[in-house]
Each structure stands twice: as structure tokens, then as C-alpha cells.
């Protein structure tokens, strides 16, 4: 996984990967980055058992009760073939329409407004009352599944498998076979 912020960084990343692989063919899963609250979900036998924020990188907050109120996160995976234990990582987001609605309600009540959707999502997920969390209509997108024996080798295939199990994956993801395809993806979303 690599984050890039300019075409020059993309080109440099692509050439570095090409060199590291000794010229062997490879693909890149190009996708947009979401700016939300990082979350890690654990499913056991297809059932959501734990949701933890990234916290300080070592220790996060257990927000399982609140995550269970987010409609876009399945409490039980769909279909079959999922591993006994599955970890997926993603971002919890507050859509702009919800952000505006919540701030309008806060303004009417004389409460301080949230500065931005990311801070509002973070504050919402840490609420002690899951009913408040449910009322704010958070959303989630998943972007990473650690490699494991029961899953496909490629990042892209793992995400598509998770999508088949009902986890929300960005619609803005494309499997690119060349640097020009990566540029085309960037041009489309720029």
C-alpha cells in the first residue's frame, strides 16, 4: 500500500515497484483515499465480534457497540467461504449531508458546531450512547484486508471478496495494468 499526492509521486512509486519486481508484470489497485476515522473490524465465523479504532497506533478504543449501529456495516457476513477469523480495515465517515443536518440541529440548540465531518465522525463514534450514534447515520468503507491463507493473494481480489460478503468497498477502485491506466484513473477522479 502506498499513498501518493502528485503525478510525480505516482510515477516514482510505479518505477520503484517495477524495479523491485525485476520487470515482472504487476497490477496496481488504484483507489481514492477516504478521510474518516480508521477502524478495524474482526469477524469470527462471519459474525462481527469487535470494532477498534486505530488510537495511538498501538492501542485503540473498543467501539463495537457503536459500530453495530452503522447500517452499512454488516453484523453478519453474507454468503459463504469467509475465513474463520477475518480482519478488515477501513474508514468511518460522516456524509456531508448528515454533517450539515447535525450542525443545523446543533445550531438551533445553541450547541457548538462540529468543525468538519471527520471530527464529527470521530466524536460520534466515541459517544457513550449508541442511540446517538445511530441517529447520526455514519457510513463506512473498507480498504484493506491483511493477507492470510484463506484469502486471495491480491489486494484487489481480497477487497472484491469482502464486497461479495456485504462489506462496503469504494466504487472508486480500479485494477490498473500500466502507468497510463493509473494516470487515466487519476484524471477521471481529479
Indicate where each model-derived feature is located.
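RNA/tRNA-interacting regions in translation and RNA-turnover enzymes
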Residues: 1-190
Amino acid at each position: 500500500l502506498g499513498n501518493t499526492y502528485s503525478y510525480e509521486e505516482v510515477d516514482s512509486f510505479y518505477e520503484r515497484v517495477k524495479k523491485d519486481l525485476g520487470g515482472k508484470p504487476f497490477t496496481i489497485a488504484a483507489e481514492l483515499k477516504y478521510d474518516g476515522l480508521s477502524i478495524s473490524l474482526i469477524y469470527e465465523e462471519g459474525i462481527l465480534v469487535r470494532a477498534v479504532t486505530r488510537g495511538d497506533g498501538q492501542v485503540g478504543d473498543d467501539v463495537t457497540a457503536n459500530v453495530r449501529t452503522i447500517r452499512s456495516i454488516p453484523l453478519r457476513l453474507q454468503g459463504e467461504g469467509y475465513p474463520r477469523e477475518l480482519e478488515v480495515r477501513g474508514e468511518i465517515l460522516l456524509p456531508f449531508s448528515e454533517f450539515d443536518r447535525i450542525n443545523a440541529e446543533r445550531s438551533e440548540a445553541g450547541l457548538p458546531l462540529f468543525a468538519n465531518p471527520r471530527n464529527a465522525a470521530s466524536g460520534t463514534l466515541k459517544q457513550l450512547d449508541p442511540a446517538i450514534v445511530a441517529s447520526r447515520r455514519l457510513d463506512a468503507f473498507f480498504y484493506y484486508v491483511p493477507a492470510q491463507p484463506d484469502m486471495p493473494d491480491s489486494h484487489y481480489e481480497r477487497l472484491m471478496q469482502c464486497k461479495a460478503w456485504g462489506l462496503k468497498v469504494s466504487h472508486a477502485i480500479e485494477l490498473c495494468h500500466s502507468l497510463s491506466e493509473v494516470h487515466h484513473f487519476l484524471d477521471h477522479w481529479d
